[in-house]
Amino acid sequence: MLRSLIILLSVFSAFSLIGNEETSVAKKSLESKTNDKNDKQQKEDVSDELSEKNTVDIRLKIITSQIKNLEASMKPYTESIFGTGEKFEMIPIPSGQFFMGSPENENDRSESEGPVNEVKISPFWMAKTETTWNCYTLFMYAEEEKMVMKIRGYKPGLNKVSDAVARPTTPYVEMSFGMGTDGFPAISMTQHAANMYCKWLSAKTGHYYRLPTEAEWEYACRAGTKTAFSFGDDEKLIDEYAWYGDNSDEKYQKVGTKKPNPWGLHDMHGNVSEWVLDQFFEDGYNKYNEIVSDPFIYGKELYPRVTRGGSWMDSPADLRSAARYPSSEDWKEQDPQLPQSIWYHTDAQFLGFRVVRPLIIPSSEEMHKYWTTEGEPD
């Protein structure tokens, strides 16, 4: 009896050991499978991430290639303002890098022109000349635009999109101040007015137009040069390229009558100062501490904004490629429209603008941002 009991206990113990071993083996097998599964999932996750990055890289390469192909096909063209008969010329500006600002040893430089920074610029077109009264008047005087279109046989209903753009109230003084209109640069507008013109022009033409950024303006003005002016450092040559205080007969002159810069742009030095989009800061380009692409300092304050190029009133030093000048609220002290339209007119008879058209069309949100840099009237 005792012997049988001992045998039974031995058999039970043996089965228990076998069971424990099987359980242990099964547990290890399960853990191994789980680890294999986790390793596989991790590998799949890494693979997915690499695949996504690869897709992003491929997309970037495709876009870059397409942009290069598009840029290679960029040519000068003449833009027509629908229904009016008015036209203006646009010049292609290639992408590239340049040193923005003036070196410390440049004569007559100001602190706000530095420090010099290397900047990358995307391709765009720029108007060959400053915006003329011939084009701007159609925006400023809505009734004149309608009359011109009617004479040319166009129905008012074709203007619905451009008619929705805000425009100035009709000024009660002659805005050229007797200096001439046909072929002369438009003057005395606020930055907001220039922006609204660009918006109206885009609606009229089907091409996206805006003011240039400060970096785009200087890049186009320099046209590959590193000197104080696009024609070199010798101020004695300035009469060939610019209207300024000593040769302007105390008024602006017809656009495009002086020599162009190396890229075919006229009056980048002198005639009228030109609005750009950026906020003005006295410490210049300190925010650019490395190579930056298409920089643009969006304005949070109404004053000051940047103007470029110098004007018919200025000295040669103010016409340098790197020279910059801040806008002032004083320019509105004798606003010919006060108090009705403080958003559109100034008495700054030296101030105008020219338009640019980026090669790549931005989103509608970006368009709105560029067109509302001076805020919107209440």
What are these model-derived regions, one by one?
Residues K258-N261:
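Short, small/polar residue-rich loop motifs at catalytic or cofactor-binding pockets
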